[in-house]
Amino acid sequence: MINSKYFFKGFKSIKGINSPALALGASFIAIGALLKNIGFNLEQSIFSTFLTYALPGSLVMAESFIVGASLINIFLAVWLVNARLYPMTVSLMPLLLHKSQPRWKYYLSCHFIAVSAWLIMKSNYQSIEKKHRIDFWIGIGTGTWSIAIIATVIGFLAADYLNKDMMIGLAIVNPVYFGCMMVGAMKSLQISLSIILGAILGPAFFFISPEWSILYGGVLAGTIAYFVGELK
């Protein structure tokens, strides 16, 4: 079973000063309004966030729906966008693994992988006994997931009062927050180098391939930072 003490400790961590709760909520208010505007009802909007729970994936799903893409194409588009979460999963799960914990917890908790929850866990895992980290992580994930769902409902109900510019402003709050958090995480050579090179190479590749510039810049920046760190 899930240890309630560590679960609620993780759940309450979303109230911290560095919590992404406000930024995450603002972005999903925009998602809720967008889903209503493209024809979703309230139940469908909630179910969408319940399953997708990632801002880029939700945006891609909505955009694909608008242009009339088939269900399989929407599924593939969201799957490809959310593939970016795989490296985060690979880097996080070894920190949570403990032989006393059942495997179903780890399979369940993979759904909570998102930049918001991942940043909270990476900042706090050392203060939690390894045996209980998975319960702490499930608490974090449940908290951020709940915020996303509640914000989607608020956005859906407030859609008539939000114009296009307001929705864009709300949607961009979360990426800005993550950018600030990444700068704050520059505590090692590898992390600092990857962020700085990414900020330089991303725009540089835009002139070569606008569609793939972020991917190319990120892969190259991360690879260089990794090998520089290994050489050190």
List each model region and its residues:
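Alpha-helical transmembrane segments of multipass membrane proteins
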Residues: 29-34, 60-61, 120, 153, ...
